[in-house]
């Protein structure tokens, strides 16, 4: 009899394989990072030996994971350790992730404000749904306040922790305008902070990905930005600058959130690095064998010259001209 966790993982992967694949990819990226001790959080307890994390054993098992299509078609007994690991990756009491359609990206663009410059549409889009009590707590904090939607760019290796633990202001490394989580209404700016990184080699999304978070932010005074005072055209200076800011006022299009309870990730935009366009098979073969081809042509030319200069050819040619 298979463990109940396997059945739940099978059901989740079968229902939305791309979403399950994404979680495996984010896990793999964190595991491969040189900062794995800090970015791979949560960490599977079955690979913890007291206070030590057995990364070598985890890396060995993760490297043997087949792609999800193959795993779903196999019997659990043949991939016991794989199913144990995938079950852990897909389990969460706080949230679930769904793949979303292209229409959702148009909605996101409207929520964040129409882009001033052309922005690339994501190859894949995912929506995060939160369970209670986390969801109820967020809306309790929100109260009657509006929601702001903005983008957050980060390295791929950070997203395993981001989706499970949220964005934490004190962990932010960009502090020119003060301590906090930096977001922007401009997707092209967020993409600068989201370089492509190595994910999961067997991913259906692709082995090299870039990820941008779309966050819901409660419109609270602790969210610093360029905003006007209520019923006025004047900028609200209390919200335009953070105490001890080295760079002065928050620039337009940026938001700096100084309270962890005021934001959460709602969508993930995923960009897959396209393989370089291959030349035609003929050109590809020629580029690999150009030296042999040139020598062959040279020898053929010598043969032609030799034949032309031969007495037999000259005799035949002279007779043909008569």
From Swiss-Prot:
The modification N6-(ADP-ribosyl)lysine is found at residues 110, 137. One of its GO terms (molecular function) is NAD+-protein mono-ADP-ribosyltransferase activity. Residues 5-91 form the PARP alpha-helical domain. It is a single-pass type IV membrane protein. The record marks 193 as: Nicotinamide-stacking aromate. Residues 94-279 form the PARP catalytic domain. This is Protein mono-ADP-ribosyltransferase PARP16. Auto-mono-ADP-ribosylated. The PARP alpha-helical domain (also named HD region) is regulatory, it packs against the catalytic domain. Residues 309-322 are lumenal. The chain crosses the membrane at residues 288-308. Its main location: endoplasmic reticulum. The keyword NAD applies. Its EC number is 2.4.2.-. It is an enzyme of class 2 (transferase). It comes from the Eukaryota. The lineage of its organism: Eukaryota, Metazoa, Chordata, Craniata, Vertebrata. Residues 1-287 are cytoplasmic. It catalyses: L-aspartyl-[protein] + NAD(+) = 4-O-(ADP-D-ribosyl)-L-aspartyl-[protein] + nicotinamide; L-glutamyl-[protein] + NAD(+) = 5-O-(ADP-D-ribosyl)-L-glutamyl-[protein] + nicotinamide; L-lysyl-[protein] + NAD(+) = N(6)-(ADP-D-ribosyl)-L-lysyl-[protein] + nicotinamide + H(+). The modification ADP-ribosyl glutamic acid is found at residue 70.
């Amino acid at each position: 009899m298979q463990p109940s966790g396997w059945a739940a993982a099978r059901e989740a992967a079968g229902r939305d394989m791309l979403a399950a694949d994404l979680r495996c990819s984010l896990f793999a990226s964190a595991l491969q990072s040189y900062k794995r001790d800090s970015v791979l959080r949560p960490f599977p307890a079955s690979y913890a030996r007291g206070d030590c994390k057995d990364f070598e054993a985890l890396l060995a098992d993760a490297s043997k994971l087949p792609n999800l299509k193959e795993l779903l078609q196999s019997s659990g007994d043949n991939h016991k350790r794989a199913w144990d690991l995938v079950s852990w990756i897909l389990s969460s009491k706080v949230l679930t992730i769904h793949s979303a359609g292209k229409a959702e990206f148009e909605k996101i663009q409207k929520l964040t404000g129409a882009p001033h410059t052309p922005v690339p549409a994501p190859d894949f889009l995912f929506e995060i749904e939160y369970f209670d009590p986390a969801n109820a707590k967020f809306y309790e904090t929100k109260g009657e306040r509006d929601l702001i939607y903005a983008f957050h760019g980060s390295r791929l290796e950070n997203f395993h922790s981001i989706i499970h633990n949220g964005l934490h202001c004190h962990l932010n490394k960009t502090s020119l305008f003060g301590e906090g989580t930096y977001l922007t209404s401009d997707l092209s700016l967020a993409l600068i902070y989201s370089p492509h990184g190595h994910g999961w080699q067997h991913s259906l999304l692709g082995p090299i990905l870039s990820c941008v978070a779309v966050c819901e932010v409660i419109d609270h005074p602790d969210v610093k930005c360029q905003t006007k005072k209520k019923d006025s055209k004047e900028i609200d200076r209390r919200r335009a600058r953070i105490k001890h800011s080295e760079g002065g006022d928050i620039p337009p299009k940026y938001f700096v959130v100084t309270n962890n309870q005021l934001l959460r990730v709602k969508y993930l935009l995923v960009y897959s690095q396209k393989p370089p366009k291959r030349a035609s098979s003929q050109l590809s073969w020629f580029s690999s064998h150009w030296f042999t081809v040139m020598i062959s042509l040279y020898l053929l030319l010598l043969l032609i010259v030799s034949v032309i200069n031969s007495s037999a050819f000259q005799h035949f040619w002279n007779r043909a001209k008569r």
